[in-house]
Each structure stands twice: as structure tokens, then as C-alpha cells.
Amino acid sequence: GTVPCGESCVFIPCITGIAGCSCKNKVCYLN
């Protein structure tokens, strides 16, 4: 929840989700 993964999740889920990233405020974050 604190480190940006450099990915947007406005239209599609976080591809970086496989690395532990999750969607928050339309941006993918790690932890």
C-alpha cells in the first residue's frame, strides 16, 4: 500500500498483482 508499482488499474487489474501489488486509488501499490 505504500510503494507505487508504476502501473495503473483504472481499466484493467494490476498485472503486477503476481508480484504482490494491489489496486488503490486507481494505481497499483506494493504493501
From Swiss-Prot:
Superkingdom of origin: Eukaryota
- Tell me one Pfam family matched here: Cyclotide
Enumerate the SUPFAM superfamilies for this protein: Cyclotides
The membrane spanning regions, by residue number, are none
Which residues are connected by disulfide bridges in this protein? C5-C21, C9-C23, C14-C28
**Which keywords accompany this UniProt record?**
Disulfide bond, Knottin, Plant defense
Cross-link Cyclopeptide (Gly-Asn) per UniProt, renumbered positions: G1-N31
The record's InterPro entries line, in alphabetical order, gives: Cyclotide (IPR005535), Cyclotide_bracelet_CS (IPR012323), Cyclotide_sf (IPR036146)
Organs and tissues of expression: Expressed in root nodules but not in seed.
Q: Which residues form a coiled coil?
A: none
What processing steps or modifications follow its translation? Contains 3 disulfide bonds.
Name its GO BP terms in alphabetical order: defense response
Task: Describe the task this protein carries out.
Answer: Probably participates in a plant defense mechanism.
Please report which protein family the annotation says this sequence is part of.
Belongs to the cyclotide family. Bracelet subfamily.
What does the entry's domain section say?
The presence of a 'disulfide through disulfide knot' structurally defines this protein as a knottin.
The protein depicted here goes by the name Cliotide T17
